[in-house]
Design a protein with these regions (language model features):
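Short beta-strand segments within Ig-like beta-sandwich modules, predominantly Fibronectin type-III
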Residues: 129-133
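Short strand-edge motifs at loop-to-beta-strand transitions and within beta-strands
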Residues: 135-137
Length: 156
């Protein structure tokens, strides 16, 4: 587990995407193969990916992957769409809290949607937030343009 090495690698990819004016998508990462020694590395990588990319694909499939010690790093919340301009995504390694901020510049803005895996909740549900099924929560736009923020966390 080398946070400095991973930080340099991610910083280089983020800078490259900015230079090209493109979103950053990580095509493939992973293959921890159920190794419990990889829990820290998986959590660190998941945090870097959540904060710096528009998406990624984890590569590894074997029976019982859900029982792998690193699986909580894969089964995490994610913004599916935000009704405005994304400002920031922060994912704490422990206890696994995700915060998503965005600016709604028009009124009414489109609704924002977030994927919540089993066992996750929206901490401060903006008024009118509702479950739409299949682990998705919908957050309606605010009445006036401005900064929005939601916190997603494991249920107590």
């Amino acid at each position: 587990r080398s946070p400095e090495r991973l930080d340099i690698m991610m910083r280089n990819r983020v800078e490259e995407a900015r230079r090209m004016g493109m979103p950053l998508l990580i095509g493939e990462w992973g293959a921890f193969y159920g190794d419990a020694r990889c829990v820290g590395a998986a959590a660190m990588m998941a945090r870097f990916l959540a904060e710096n990319t528009v998406g990624e694909f984890y590569w590894d499939y074997h029976r019982g992957i859900e029982q792998g010690a690193f699986f909580p790093s894969l089964s995490r919340p994610s913004p599916l769409r935000v009704g405005g301009f994304p400002v920031g995504i922060r994912m704490a390694e422990s206890p696994g809290v995700m915060q998503v901020e965005w600016t709604e510049e028009t009124a009414p803005a489109p609704a924002s949607e977030f994927h919540l895996p089993d066992g996750w909740v929206m901490e401060e549900a903006p008024s009118g937030g509702k479950w739409t099924g299949a682990g998705t929560v919908s957050v309606p736009p605010a009445e006036k343009p401005g900064m929005r923020k939601v916190t997603l966390r494991p249920a107590s």
